[in-house]
Amino acid sequence: MRTLVILAAILLVALQAQAEPLQARTDEATAAQEQIPTDNPEVVVSLAWDESLAPKDSVPGLRKNMACYCRIPACLAGERRYGTCFYRRRVWAFCC
C-alpha cells in the first residue's frame, strides 16, 4: 500500500513537470491573441515558431525560394510544420 502511494506521488510530480512548459506556451499564445486589434480593418497575422525547427542553410538558396503558408488543420503533403500562426482568433499551422 505504501509503495502504491509513493508510485502515485512520483507519477503526479512527473506529470506536473511536463505540464509546466505546456502552460507557458499556452500563456504565450493567449497573450499573442489578446494583442490582435478587433476594430482595425487591416489584416493582422501573428507568427510563432520554434527556431530549432527552422530549415538550415546547408543547401544554398533553400530559404530564399521556400514558400510558407498558414493552414488549417494541418500541412499538406510535402510540407513541414515549423510553427503556429494566429489569425482571426484561430490557431493555424505554419507550413513550409
From Swiss-Prot:
Coiled-coil zones: none
Top-rank lineage group of the source organism: Eukaryota
Disulfide feature: 68-96, 70-85, 75-95
Query: Where found, per UniProt?
Result: Secreted
Q: Which UniProt keywords apply?
A: Antibiotic, Antimicrobial, Defensin, Disulfide bond, Fungicide, Secreted, Signal
- Report the main location listed first in the record: secreted
The stretch of residues making up the signal peptide is 1-19
Q: Name one Pfam family in it.
A: Defensin_1
Xref: InterPro entries: Alpha-defensin (IPR016327), Alpha-defensin_C (IPR006081), Alpha-defensin_N (IPR002366), Beta/alpha-defensin_C (IPR006080)
Residue ranges annotated as propeptide in the record: 20-66
BP-aspect Gene Ontology terms: antibacterial humoral response; antimicrobial humoral immune response mediated by antimicrobial peptide; cellular response to lipopolysaccharide; defense response to fungus; defense response to Gram-negative bacterium; defense response to Gram-positive bacterium; disruption of plasma membrane integrity in another organism; innate immune response in mucosa
Q: Which GO terms describe its cellular component?
A: extracellular space
- Which family does the record claim for this protein? Belongs to the alpha-defensin family.
Q: What is known about what this protein does?
A: Has bacteriostatic activity against Gram-positive bacteria S.aureus and L.monocytogenes and Gram-negative bacterium E.coli and antifungal activity against C.neoformans.
Q: What is this protein called?
A: Neutrophil defensin 3
